[in-house]
Every structure is written in structure tokens, then in C-alpha cells.
């Protein structure tokens, strides 16, 4: 039996450091073997996961000694937070650990999609020379719209402003008198932001209130030729409506790192859609961020278990 069970990949140096204070089982294959995971709960006081391990009531019932769930990241939709609270189990996200990675990912997507030239390698190597078709747009002076204005969005806003972008944000949970609005235009209505922004980036959790927040009506409201980038959670965007908007060329492009079903299947509604860049839920995952969130999580777990921090 181990004090700590780790079911997904994690920085090995951080794991080794945790082993100085706790007995640890580190098995990144457990996420793909639910039965084996559920049979591994005896004596485990802390479980460390990423976004694929489902921490639900079924799992909690098989981990009777569990006191903490360390989340290697910030999204909590794979964790039944209410069930954990009822059992007095601490849920410990690695807040701030992947902020830089996500912000850089979003800005890269904006540059790639607005300029339009970076994915031309096959055509150029085939002898085409489509200079006029790939002329694209500069990003300086463009307006970035942020849906949600938490820590990652605020860091992204600062970086975008340094590049000469105008930034506006919509977040009904940030009071109008919050100091965060001093440097960013506040859009009271989501529709106002969608109408004005040249690029829209999503930074909200998935909930009943945000499921399909960006639906067909919202996409139609967006500025013609604008971009949509989703690094938040699949389900916030209606993928069928997005595919239609891209095919109709109302949107200028989209970059999705998260999807309603992961991984995608060959018959996805997004298959064959031009103007789309798709990545496998990796916006927040770099070598540097993996180290940061691993060490943050190790410290969080140590504190929760009352050992050296």
C-alpha cells in the first residue's frame, strides 16, 4: 500500500522528491485501466491526476482513506468536487502552473491564423507560389476578446497588449469595480465582445451555464473573418455549428485544443474543415509547465498530508 498514487504522467524529479516523505506508486498507465485503478485504493491518502482520470463517487468509494486529490493542472471537470467536499477530501489544483504555456499557445494561434502563410509548406514544396492568396493580416492593432477573465486570461491580456493588440474581456463574475478592469475594456454583454473582437479566446470552466456558450447564434454574432480559440474545455463550443461557420467562411479560422469528445473519431463533424487547427489538449503542457505544476502539486499534497512542505 502507498500513501500517494499517481495515475498520469508527471515530472519524475518531483515524484522522487515526494518519495522522501511518502510512499508513492507512480503508474501513468492507470488512467487507461479503470479496473486496476479502482482496485488500487486501499491505504491511499492522496491521489494525483491530470484531466483524464475520473474522480467520481465510484472511485471515492474504493479509496476509503483518501484525504486529497492533487490536480496536475487547473480544470476540475473530471473531479466530482461536491462528492470530495462531502467526504472532506481536499481538491488541490496547480493554480498558475500552466499560465505561460496557455498564453503563448493562444498568441501563436492568433499569429498563425491571421497571417495565414505558415501552413503552406506542402503547396510551396509542390511548386506553387500563392503569395497573394496568403497575404494575411498583421496582429498589431487587432482586438482580442477574452471570454472569462481569470489568471490565464489576465496574463494573456498583458502579453497581447505588449504586442500592440487592443484587449477587451467579458466576465460577469469579476465585479465592475475590480482593479483588473483598469487596463482592459470591460464588455458587459458577451454579444458586444463577439461583435467587436478580431480574435476570441475562451477562458471559462465547463458548466451547465457555459455548455455550448459559443453556439450557432454566438458564432453568427462574431465579426466576419474573426478567429475563435478554445483552450478551456470541450463542450463550450458547439462543434457542429463551428464547422458550419468555417465552411461558410463566416469565421476566418479557429484553433481548438479541447473537444466535446476526446480523442476525436474519424467521423468527427470537424473532419476536413478548412481553416481549423486542432491539437490534442496540450495548450497547457510544455516541459516547463509540466515541471511547475508537478512541483506545485507535490507541495500541495505534502501540506494536505501534514508532512514536510
Curated annotation (Swiss-Prot):
One of its GO terms (molecular function) is NAD binding. The keyword Thylakoid does not apply. The keyword Nucleus does not apply. InterPro entries: D-2-hydroxyacid_DH, D-isomer_2_OHA_DH_cat_dom, D-isomer_DH_CS, D-isomer_DH_NAD-bd, NAD(P)-bd_dom_sf. NAD(+) binds at residues 151-152, 171, 231-233, 257, 281-284. It catalyses: (2S)-3-sulfolactate + NAD(+) = 3-sulfopyruvate + NADH + H(+). Its EC number is 1.1.1.310. The active site is at residues 233, 262, 281. It holds the Pfam family 2-Hacid_dh. Keywords: NAD, Oxidoreductase. It comes from the Bacteria. Dehydrogenase of the (R,S)-sulfolactate degradation pathway that only acts on the (S)-enantiomer of 3-sulfolactate. Together with ComC, provides a racemase system that converts (2S)-3-sulfolactate to (2R)-3-sulfolactate, which is degraded further by (2R)-sulfolactate sulfo-lyase. Specific for NAD. Also able to form sulfolactate from sulfopyruvate. Belongs to the D-isomer specific 2-hydroxyacid dehydrogenase family. This is (S)-sulfolactate dehydrogenase. It comes from Chromohalobacter salexigens (strain ATCC BAA-138 / DSM 3043 / CIP 106854 / NCIMB 13768 / 1H11). The gene is slcC.
